[in-house]
């Protein structure tokens, strides 16, 4: 199960693989991390989603400040989970249309997020990178910023978990932000045009690794069956149509 897989991975300290050792990471380059993502996905693609989303921390490490590094990166290295909250009911591939609202709370010296995110992989994660509209009156990508939401702060409800065909070990959620406390990651207005672009490049690599791992696992299953299944007094792998 995904829970037992998570327990095994945490015991072996395979989180924060690419993060510096001073934060509790392993300081690996991206290549061995991607190889591990492929292996994990071959064993359990659902857990692979949960585990591989640790690469969201790359974006926080690259664009966050030192205070955010010291507070958040050790938590991911210790096994806490992450998600990237981008998609909305009216903003799928067209992320310029994101309307989840971010307003600055001067009294509390923090940002507040209000709105809905949909189809969020690992939506019950501990730390979320959230794309939100911080510039009032804007309608395009230049009005979007990236925020860090910590589950410990509260203010976000999981309204729905999607009933998917597979990958059940990783919940895909609809999230409702209700005045949720958050903090800015990097600079305002660069959420989509800079930070999400970097975030998605890492995610695409992770999905590719997951796909290769799943394909290899499916091939191994098919090969084992073809060697075991017998028809006309021989294993079906000996028939050219199957062997090819």
Task: Give the role of each language-model region.
Residues 1-6, 10:
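Single conserved hydrophobic/aromatic residue that forms the stacking wall/gate
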Residues 7, 52-53, 64-100, 109:
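Internal maturation/activation junctions in enzymes
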Residues 11-78, 120-123:
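Internal helix-loop-helix
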Residues 15-22, 37-43, 52-58, 66, ...:
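Glycine- and acidic
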Residues 90-93, 119-122, 138, 164-171:
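Short Gly/Pro-enriched turn/cap motifs at secondary-structure boundaries
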Residues 110, 114-156:
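A short core secondary-structure module
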Residues 152-155, 159, 171-203, 220-238:
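A glycine-rich, basic-preceded beta-loop-alpha segment at the flavin cofactor/substrate interface
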